[in-house]
Each structure stands twice: as structure tokens, then as C-alpha cells.
Amino acid sequence: MFVYRLELTLHEKVFFASREIDELFQTEPVLGNYALTYALGLAVTPYRLSEREDRPYYREDFSILNDAGIYVTPGTPLGAPALEVERFNGMVESYWYKMANNAVVSDLAVRLDNARAPATNFPQKGRLRMLSRGNRFACYVFAREALMLPRYIRLGKFLGKTHVAVTHEWRDPPTHTARAVQVDAFLNPLDLSAETQLGYYDFFNLPPVPLIRNAQLSGPVYALGDVHLPVGMGFGFPPLETPTRGRGRRRAS
């Protein structure tokens, strides 16, 4: 088993809609492990979904990685995260326009023939709260075989450039059975093995799956320096129609 500790440094602003409140689209200071897996090139999927592919294919993409023994943890911020807010306005400048299917329509055919505009879900104006340049995050990559990881990746809706540095590498790190050990890093509760028992934790309800942090857990763990991470993590899959729920006692964050 190879374990890599990656330090990610943002060279450009990074935005993804963790939470939407009216016209404010917020980026939470955490990098989801699904997004990191795609960005690192470990799973490959088209950037845009076609009309036939109207849902993400997490199960199909990540089942291959589970079979290969590859797993990526969420990215935890190092230090206090820096955020900034920018305003955007995509309203048209034509004399006539109207709202239709959550989009601004200025097409003359729509105006004259009352044709139905294609449905869309792109906001026309609002504010974006983004991660600033210089933010740093740490994540861990597990693999049965050695991996060649890229030095630069693209993250977020606008594909912000991010530097990747492997700061530590372990081969067959030591493990032990812990009881009520504190894990400060972000974890995906769907990815924990059945041998890992959760106590309390901070819960973050983020799409596509919730994450937890500051968790107290018991079970087999890797000893990676002064960091402990659960043994046996693998990609779990959220149900398509029902909400996901974490295990254990939830503590307000």
C-alpha cells in the first residue's frame, strides 16, 4: 500500500457552488474527494453532460478505482482559508428580453412566435464567494501500486490552476486499532469501512455528498506521522433519490 500526502496550492481563484442562498453562491473551504479524484486524472469523465447523460456517473467511474485499490480523501484547508466575493451579471443588453425557464431570452423568434426556450439552470446575475489565490489544502491518496501524480491540476467551475506537491510518501504504513482517536481532517462518511465506528463529528451538508470533520472514531487506523486515518476507505455511492445520512451522533458545526 502506497500513501501520498498532497499539498494543493491555488494559483487562481476557485469556485464551486457548495451552497446557494438567493443570489449568493458560496464556496465552502473544503475540496470534495470526488472533485479531486477527477482533477488528478484518476477518473475520467466529460466536463459537460450531454442530454443523454443527464446525471453524474460516480458509481461507474469510482467502482474501477475501488477494484484497483485507489482512494482520495477530501482536501482539508491548511490554516485560515481566504475567501473573496465577486459580482457577475450576464443580463443581455438588447432592447427586449424576458425570463423563460430560468434564463434570459432575447431571441426574436421567441418574441414573435412565443416559442418555448430550452430549459436551463444558469443564473444570470448574483455574487460568487470564491477561494482566493494562495489557499493551501492537504489530501491523501491511497493506492496498491505506485502512482505518477500531476504537478498541476484544474479545480472548480472555472478550472482554476492548482499546484500539486507530494510532501510525504509512505509504503505499507503502520496500522493499529485505535479507540476514540481524534481525526481533524475532512472525511467522507460514505467511504468508511464497516470496522470504523464513528462517535461525534462536525457535519457539513455539501453536494454531492456530506462530509465530516473533527471526528472521534474507533477501529483500525493508519499512523501517518502525527495524523491518523481510517483503514479500508473506499468510494461509497450516494443514493440517487433519497438523502444521505451520516452514522453516529451529529454535532452542530
Where are these regions (language model features)?
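Short N-terminal binding/cap micro-motifs at the start of the first secondary-structure element
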Residues: 14-20
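Short amphipathic
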Residues: 2-12
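Short linear interaction motifs
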Residues: 20-22, 112-124, 241-244, 251-252
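Basic polyanion-binding and macromolecular-assembly surfaces
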Residues: 129, 134-253
